[in-house]
Amino acid sequence: MNKSILTKREKQVFEQLIINKTTKDIAHLLSISEKTVRNHISNVMQKLGVKGRAGAVVELLRLNEISL
């Protein structure tokens, strides 16, 4: 079984980002603070060694961690 590099919550955040949800939208949807959403995004960017949300999305798609 392949283990995801993303936590369940990180995956939920990025699944919303790829459908163009804002940080505020994601926070409301997941019942977490906007700061927590930004932390999840930042953590994923650090794990992947990329700069920016778009770079993280591209890399996660390439790794089949998320899908469109």
Predicted regions and their residues:
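Hydrophobic residues on short alpha-helical segments
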Residues: 11-15, 45, 57
